[in-house]
Amino acid sequence: MHVKKGDKVKVITGKDKGKSGKVLAAFPKKDRVLIEGINMVKKHTKPSNVNPQGGILNVEAPIHVSNVMLIDPKTGEPTRVGYEVKGDKKVRVAKKSGEVIDK
């Protein structure tokens, strides 16, 4: 998967196209990511011990990883991700600037 938790990404398709946010969680088996403030859905909750009132909450829903692009740390623009072997480590590299993403 080309994005990881903590990456800054931009949504390229869908109802939140053009918005950007930080990846809160990645689900590689499902090819989905959870992004802060993106793809908000209303979740209806029953009253419980934690939330005695119950009600409707706004929460983020995961979106498919193909709908997001990583933001290049050097230029601040969306970029594709490549991989290079540096020493004995495989690192992610921004295609636009050549900047190494993994530190």
UniProtKB/Swiss-Prot annotation:
UniProt keyword terms in alphabetical order: Ribonucleoprotein, Ribosomal protein, RNA-binding, rRNA-binding
CDD domains: KOW_RPL26
GO cellular component: cytosolic large ribosomal subunit
Any one of the GO BP annotations: translation
Entry keyword annotation includes rRNA-binding: yes
Protein known as: Large ribosomal subunit protein uL24
A GO molecular-function descriptor: rRNA binding
Pfam families: KOW, ribosomal_L24
Similarity annotation: Belongs to the universal ribosomal protein uL24 family.
PROSITE patterns xrefs: RIBOSOMAL_L24
Subunit structure: Part of the 50S ribosomal subunit.
Role summary: One of two assembly initiator proteins, it binds directly to the 5'-end of the 23S rRNA, where it nucleates assembly of the 50S subunit.
